[in-house]
């Protein structure tokens, strides 16, 4: 049985931990409000731009000389995967879900005979992939570190992907990220960025095309909008991931704070029982000694 001194030390240690987790929960909650607002504001814009460019792509998909961001390289051999994780832990299953989804995707593509390249974003994903797939990593990108995500980060990554595509370093690019649903739920999502997915059905394409009028022509618009769309989609996924990280961290720290409270209650009960037992034993010894005299 632990001594009273040991129990007091353990209670003090758990109380200190509870203060830390409670503070981290409040910080995550404050960051979550901003991150959630930014992610939700970006969704309609990113979705509308994706639909518009899919419409544009559908109208010209049979023409020659299309941009590689739309038509691809004509091959489906080398797949570049961009898993988005956080730089820091203490976020529940946030990073583990992305790592598991990425690993499953890698194995599925390899089973199909594809060549895999990895460009992880965030330290946690990079560290995980280095342990299992170090030979597939071409480079890694630092995450936001819990700070607000600037559009310049997405623009820089988009330009880098465009340059890699032009050099023939990959044929297909897919991002793996956590889509923010609510504080308690984030969904690991795979989204193909390059080449742009366009409708294959002429009826669907023409039906959606009735909502748009393009000026200037489709080809000129594609040349200018495709790079911008890539940056916008990357930015939207970064915002979703940032909101998901703060939501997962807030939930994890709330659970940790609750568990610490329960642990304190259990330790306090044990402490009181031990103290009571010690007092009882001392009284018995005193009474026994008095009777012996």
Curated annotation (Swiss-Prot):
<keyword id="KW-0813">Transport</keyword>
<comment type="function">
    <text>Produces ATP from ADP in the presence of a proton gradient across the membrane. The gamma chain is believed to be important in regulating ATPase activity and the flow of protons through the CF(0) complex.</text>
</comment>
<dbReference type="InterPro" id="IPR023632">
    <property type="entry name" value="ATP_synth_F1_gsu_CS"/>
</dbReference>
<comment type="similarity">
    <text>Belongs to the ATPase gamma chain family.</text>
</comment>
<keyword id="KW-0406">Ion transport</keyword>
<dbReference type="GO" id="GO:0005886">
    <property type="term" value="C:plasma membrane"/>
</dbReference>
<dbReference type="InterPro" id="IPR035968">
    <property type="entry name" value="ATP_synth_F1_ATPase_gsu"/>
</dbReference>
<keyword id="KW-1003">Cell membrane</keyword>
<keyword id="KW-0375">Hydrogen ion transport</keyword>
<dbReference type="GO" id="GO:0045259">
    <property type="term" value="C:proton-transporting ATP synthase complex"/>
</dbReference>
<dbReference type="GO" id="GO:0046933">
    <property type="term" value="F:proton-transporting ATP synthase activity, rotational mechanism"/>
</dbReference>
<dbReference type="GO" id="GO:0005524">
    <property type="term" value="F:ATP binding"/>
</dbReference>
<protein>
    <recommendedName>
        <fullName>ATP synthase gamma chain</fullName>
    </recommendedName>
</protein>
<dbReference type="Pfam" id="PF00231">
    <property type="entry name" value="ATP-synt"/>
</dbReference>
<keyword id="KW-0472">Membrane</keyword>
<dbReference type="InterPro" id="IPR000131">
    <property type="entry name" value="ATP_synth_F1_gsu"/>
</dbReference>
<dbReference type="GO" id="GO:0042777">
    <property type="term" value="P:proton motive force-driven plasma membrane ATP synthesis"/>
</dbReference>
<keyword id="KW-0139">CF(1)</keyword>
<keyword id="KW-0066">ATP synthesis</keyword>
<comment type="subunit">
    <text>F-type ATPases have 2 components, CF(1) - the catalytic core - and CF(0) - the membrane proton channel. CF(1) has five subunits: alpha(3), beta(3), gamma(1), delta(1), epsilon(1). CF(0) has three main subunits: a, b and c.</text>
</comment>
<keyword id="KW-0997">Cell inner membrane</keyword>
């Amino acid at each position: 049985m632990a001594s009273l001194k040991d129990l007091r030390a353990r209670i003090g240690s758990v109380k200190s931990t509870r203060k830390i987790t409670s503070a981290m929960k409040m910080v995550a909650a404050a960051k979550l409000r901003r991150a959630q607002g930014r992610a939700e504001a970006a969704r309609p814009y990113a979705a509308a731009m994706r639909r518009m460019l899919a419409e544009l792509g559908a109208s010209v998909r049979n023409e020659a000389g299309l941009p590689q961001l739309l038509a691809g390289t004509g091959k489906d051999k080398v797949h570049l995967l961009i898993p988005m994780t956080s730089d820091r832990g203490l976020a529940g299953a946030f990073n583990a879900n992305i790592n598991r989804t990425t690993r499953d995707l890698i194995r599925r593509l390899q089973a199909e005979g594809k060549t895999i390249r990895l460009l992880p974003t965030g330290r946690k994903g990079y560290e995980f992939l280095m342990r299992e797939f170090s030979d597939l990593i071409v480079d890694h990108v630092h995450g936001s570190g819990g700070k607000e995500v600037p559009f310049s980060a997405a623009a820089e990554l988009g330009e880098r992907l465009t340059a890699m595509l032009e050099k023939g370093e990959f044929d297909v690019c897919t991002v793996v990220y956590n889509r923010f649903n609510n504080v308690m739920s984030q969904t690991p999502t795979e989204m193909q960025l390059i080449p742009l997915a366009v409708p294959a059905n002429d009826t669907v394409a023409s039906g959606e095309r009735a909502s748009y009028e393009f000026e200037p022509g489709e080809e000129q618009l594609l040349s200018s909008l495709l790079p911008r769309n890539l940056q916008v989609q990357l930015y939207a996924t970064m915002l979703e991931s940032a909101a998901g990280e703060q939501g997962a961290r807030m939930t994890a720290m709330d659970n940790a704070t609750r568990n610490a409270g329960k642990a304190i209650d259990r330790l306090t009960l044990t402490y009181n029982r031990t103290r009571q037992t010690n007092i009882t034993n001392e009284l018995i010894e005193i009474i026994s000694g008095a009777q012996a005299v």
